[in-house]
């Protein structure tokens, strides 16, 4: 059972059929969506959500995250999803997430790094004291956090290209964070189930962009790099 933090946001849900896989377990993209929803709900509750960002021409962009799944919840299981900011430094903000069962056991957790962007100037900027004070800061999870950058192998197998579809675009006009992982998972073998994931976002894909997945398998991990047609990276996804 986790102690509730002063700036923690929590909402309850039930695992839906539309969120499950062949084994009736919650999928990784669904876990990611729950975590994203939690941070969005908290921002909206603070008055710092989509409308605030549009008015002030600011936005939080996800730079990287590490997700660890202890157990995939099953169809119909009641779950709690929580998030809280853990610190701010310059243009960066750190945020933790947990997904718990009704007994308070952690089923999945994540550590993430976000960049605050000035959309008018097209560059990172430091969030105002108003924003920092509203979010607050609490201690991070007592977990071993992986570094932000993912080591990329030199040799890959190039897979079939994928075009970004309309349904993959979010309110920022970019491909949603979850969709990069969903595309990367398509090149994995069907019987593979991983419990640790890292994603490093390099640049945003937009509607119509071509993503070329490149996969490399090592002894203890699988790396999928999503590149454009000039071999520039959109995202690096690591599965363990």
Show the residue positions of the predicted features.
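Hot-dog-fold acyl-thioester-processing enzymes
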Residues: 1-62, 105, 109-111, 118-192
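HotDog/MaoC-like acyl-thioester-processing domains
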Residues: 2, 6-11, 66-70, 74-150, ...
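Exposed loop/turn and edge beta-strand positions of beta-sandwich/beta-sheet ligand-binding modules
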Residues: 63, 93, 195
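Acidic/His-leaning functional-site neighborhoods
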Residues: 156, 162-238
């Amino acid at each position: 059972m986790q102690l509730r933090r002063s700036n923690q946001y929590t909402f309850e849900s039930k695992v839906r059929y539309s969120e499950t896989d062949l084994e009736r377990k919650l999928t990784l993209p669904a876990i990611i969506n729950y975590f994203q929803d939690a941070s969005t709900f908290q921002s909206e509750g603070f008055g710092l959500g989509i409308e605030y960002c549009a008015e002030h021409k600011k936005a939080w962009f996800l730079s990287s995250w590490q997700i660890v799944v202890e157990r995939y919840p099953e169809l119909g299981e009641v779950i709690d999803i929580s998030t809280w900011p853990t610190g701010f430094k310059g243009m960066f903000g750190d945020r933790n997430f947990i997904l718990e069962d009704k007994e308070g056991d952690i089923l999945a957790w994540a550590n993430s790094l976000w960049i605050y962007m000035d959309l008018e100037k097209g560059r990172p900027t430091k969030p105002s004291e108003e924003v920092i004070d509203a979010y607050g800061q609490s201690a991070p999870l007592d977990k071993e956090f992986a570094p932000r950058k993912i080591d990329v192998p030199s040799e890959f197998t190039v897979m079939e290209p994928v075009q970004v579809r309309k349904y993959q675009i979010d309110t920022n006009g970019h491909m949603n964070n979850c969709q990069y992982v969903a595309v990367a998972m398509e090149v994995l073998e069907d019987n593979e189930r991983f419990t640790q994931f890292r994603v490093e976002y390099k640049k945003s894909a937009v509607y119509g962009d071509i993503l070329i997945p490149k996969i490399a398998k090592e002894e203890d991990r699988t790396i999928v790099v999503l590149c454009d047609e000039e071999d520039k990276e959109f995202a690096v996804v690591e599965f363990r």
